[in-house]
């Protein structure tokens, strides 16, 4: 057994072979490497599959034996300081390794076809393999030094992948925004690491936890300073996992290719913050108030992400805000001490969200056959609709992922989310009300996305659409057009003439079509995983002997509430309540977004009935306020732009003016005086060498005389 663990250090290095081989091939055999570029997708999948098989084997060993293995190699610089490098294999490591590899393999298979015609095909697979390697290095790290190194590499890869199409201004701005926002969190993480090293004198996790626990127990450390350092560590997780208030980069990150979005949202970048908090949970548990702070940030993010997703027209941005909200649930669970619930939801959400993003990519791929390559149009749900008959497999996959995310039994997210919801009542009734209420919001906005995309008729021809996109901080109307009023109140109905026909249609010669098998296979496999993965964590109290997750996590459980058993009656009661809330959200989404014109030939009667009702007017005002809030991203981006970006620019202008008018002028004066002096000496000596020598020896003699005189 120990021999197996000794080879675990290769986990992050195996995927790293792909970028190294591609780089060497482009240097030595550039033409052959480019001509055989499709071969590299197979290499990427093969190497990541090796890591997946090894990770699964380690996980089976841990489930059977419940062992934790750590290897540390010390590099002694002097007697007082040494750097330690190594790797840690525990349940958290094995869970994250399996998530990264399984989702990564499916995304790579999908990407082979999705990126087939892109000129940056080789660059894409280089970045993706490096991304997986960096994430695997992060999850196997045994100390803060390695965590920070791989943390920065993950951030670098996200910058490269979000800005993959860097010639597009939107993508270039998005990757910069993500990079700068994460720098705030990374700086906090660095300060927190240095603070805890100053307190404990160690970077290694297990040793640091033990020392800090002893110091706090004996009251030999300032609790205020320890709490501050812990909060700084958590700031790093806030930025990476797009939690409030450092969430602003996440929707703009959708400028990258869709497979990247699937990997980022399922198992890598945003999961890194959850992983960090889970890894440091023994540290946070012994520090007063920090756990409440974690749960508070999480519950704010749960509600904020759900409300901002209510009015998105870009299908990928709607899913991005969904990710933000679901990550908030995981943070709430970690803040409550429900370690198992948080990791369970991390697992189920990863596969469900990967399925949704890959299905969304398939939809975008099919829309490009009609409107050409235009992300502003191909991702806009307003011009979609009626895709069920064109992409039936993709539609089924998206529907299954939607039902899972809504918490509909027996799909994956139902089991994990209900566990978090049940624990929330024991922690805080206020938090519980928000968490349970957001279940309805989640069901509403997810079925809104589904209905706008797949139901009704294809809306490419309607004239009320403009694909023009705004800057992230600008408001955007329902139809994607900039304006003072971002909401069209009668958003369910398009402009029609007296006969009930569309006023303006754009003719198109082709229909959307289903994606190829290499894009459908990962979706079908994820459908199966989404259906069965939740059964791994069914509590034993329900009469099913399937709770593999608890046995898997047994060596590293830090739970607060799972000492209480849950009987079948209580479980069914909570299931009925959460399911009822979810179905209410689905029902409201159907009322608002189910195309009424599918059953009626003319819109005139329907429009008149809706417009003459007083309740309709009041409802429209409420809808307008909600949509205005959502479209303007709760005005948080605007606030940052006005109070941070603009102020920094003004300050930089002041510094620039000071530099030009004061600093530069001072040095220019010295330069001018030197020029005058040199010109004077030149004319004084008539530009002859004997005169220069005379003045030289004259002044040297004076200097020597004064020196010896003193």
Curated annotation (Swiss-Prot):
One Gene Ontology term from the biological process aspect of the record: ATP synthesis coupled electron transport
One of the Pfam families matching this protein, by short name: Proton_antipo_N
Xref: Gene3D superfamilies: 1.20.5.2700
Similarity comment: Belongs to the complex I subunit 5 family.
GO cellular component: chloroplast thylakoid membrane
Known function: NDH shuttles electrons from NAD(P)H:plastoquinone, via FMN and iron-sulfur (Fe-S) centers, to quinones in the photosynthetic chain and possibly in a chloroplast respiratory chain. The immediate electron acceptor for the enzyme in this species is believed to be plastoquinone. Couples the redox reaction to proton translocation, and thus conserves the redox energy in a proton gradient.
Keyword Transferase: no
Keywords noted in UniProt: Chloroplast, Membrane, NAD, NADP, Plastid, Plastoquinone, Quinone, Thylakoid, Translocase, Transmembrane, Transmembrane helix, Transport
Reaction(s) this enzyme catalyzes, per UniProt: a plastoquinone + NADH + (n+1) H(+)(in) = a plastoquinol + NAD(+) + n H(+)(out); a plastoquinone + NADPH + (n+1) H(+)(in) = a plastoquinol + NADP(+) + n H(+)(out)
Subunit structure: NDH is composed of at least 16 different subunits, 5 of which are encoded in the nucleus.
UniProt membrane topology term: Multi-pass membrane protein
Record organism: Ipomoea purpurea (Common morning glory)
Taxonomic classification: Eukaryota, Viridiplantae, Streptophyta, Embryophyta, Tracheophyta
Record-given protein name: NAD(P)H-quinone oxidoreductase subunit 5, chloroplastic
A GO molecular-function annotation: NADH dehydrogenase (ubiquinone) activity
EC number: 7.1.1.-
């Amino acid at each position: 057994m120990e021999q197996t663990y000794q080879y675990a250090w290769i986990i992050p290095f195996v995927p790293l072979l792909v970028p190294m081989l591609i780089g060497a091939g482009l240097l030595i055999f550039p033409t052959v490497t480019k001509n055989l570029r499709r071969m590299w997708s197979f290499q990427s999948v093969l190497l990541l599959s090796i890591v997946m098989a090894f990770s699964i084997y380690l996980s089976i060993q841990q489930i059977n034996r419940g062992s934790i293995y750590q290897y540390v190699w010390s590099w002694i610089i002097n007697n007082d300081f040494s750097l330690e490098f190594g790797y840690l294999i525990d349940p958290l490591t094995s869970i994250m390794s399996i998530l990264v590899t399984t989702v990564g393999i499916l995304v790579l298979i999908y990407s082979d076809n999705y990126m087939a015609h892109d000129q940056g095909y080789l660059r894409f697979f280089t970045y993706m393999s490096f991304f997986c390697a960096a994430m695997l290095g992060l999850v196997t790290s045994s100390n803060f030094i390695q965590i920070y190194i791989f943390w920065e590499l993950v951030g670098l890869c996200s910058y490269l992948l979000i800005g993959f199409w860097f010639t597009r201004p939107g993508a270039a701005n998005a990757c910069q925004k993500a990079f700068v926002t994460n720098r705030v969190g990374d700086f906090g993480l660095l300060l927190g690491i240095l603070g805890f090293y100053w307190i404990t004198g160690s970077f290694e996790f297990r040793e640091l936890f033990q020392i800090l626990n002893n110091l706090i127990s004996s009251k030999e450390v300032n609790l205020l300073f320890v709490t501050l350092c812990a909060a700084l560590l958590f700031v790093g997780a806030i930025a990476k996992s797009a939690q409030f208030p450092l969430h602003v980069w996440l929707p703009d990150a959708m400028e990258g290719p869709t497979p990247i979005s699937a990997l980022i949202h399922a198992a890598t970048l945003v999961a890194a913050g959850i992983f960090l908090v889970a890894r440091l949970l023994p540290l946070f548990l012994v520090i007063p108030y920090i756990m409440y702070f974690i749960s508070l940030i999480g519950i704010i993010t749960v509600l904020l992400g759900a409300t901002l997703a209510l009015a998105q027209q870009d299908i990928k941005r709607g899913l991005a805000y969904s990710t933000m909200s679901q990550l908030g649930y995981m943070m709430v669970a970690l803040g409550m001490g429900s370690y198992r619930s948080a990791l369970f939801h991390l697992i189920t959400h990863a596969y469900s969200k990967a399925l949704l993003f890959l299905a969304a990519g398939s939809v975008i791929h099919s829309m490009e056959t009609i409107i050409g390559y235009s992300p502003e149009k191909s991702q806009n749900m307003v011009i979609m609709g009626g895709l069920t008959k064109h992409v039936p497999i993709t539609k089924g996959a998206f529907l299954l992922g939607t039902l899972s995310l809504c918490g509909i039994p027996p799909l994956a997210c139902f089991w994990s989310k209900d566990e978090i919801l049940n624990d929330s009542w024991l922690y805080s009734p206020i938090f519980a009300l928000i968490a349970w209420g957001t279940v309805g919001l989640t069901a509403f906005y997810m079925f809104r996305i589904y209905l706008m995309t797949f139901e009704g008729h294809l809306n490419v021809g309607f004239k009320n659409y403009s694909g023009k996109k705004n800057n992230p901080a600008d408001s955007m109307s329902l139809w994607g057009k900039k304006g003072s009023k971002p909401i069209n109140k009668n958003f369910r109905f398009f402009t029609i003439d007296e006969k009930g026909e569309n006023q303006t249609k754009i003719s198109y010669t082709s229909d959307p079509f289903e994606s190829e098998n290499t894009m459908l296979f990962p979706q079908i496999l994820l459908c199966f995983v989404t259906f069965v993965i939740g059964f791994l964590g069914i509590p034993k109290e329900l009469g099913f002997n399937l709770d593999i997750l608890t046995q898997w996590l047994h060596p590293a459980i830090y739970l607060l509430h799972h000492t209480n058993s849950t009987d079948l009656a209580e479980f069914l009661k909570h299931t009925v309540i959460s399911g009822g809330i979810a179905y209410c959200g689905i029902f409201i989404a159907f009322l608002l977004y189910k195309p009424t014109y599918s059953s009626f030939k003319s819109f005139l009667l329907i429009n008149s009935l809706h417009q003459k009702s007083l309740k309709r007017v009041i409802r429209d005002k409420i809808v307008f306020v909600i949509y205005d809030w959502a479209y303007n991203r709760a005005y948080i981006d605007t606030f940052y732009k006005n109070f941070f970006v603009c102020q920094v620019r003004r300050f930089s202008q002041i510094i620039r003016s000071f530099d030009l008018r004061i600093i530069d002028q001072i040095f220019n004066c010295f330069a001018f005086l030197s020029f005058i002096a040199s010109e004077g000496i030149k004319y004084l000596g008539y530009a002859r060498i004997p005169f220069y020598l005379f003045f030289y020896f004259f002044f040297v003699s004076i200097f020597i005389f004064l020196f010896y005189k003193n």
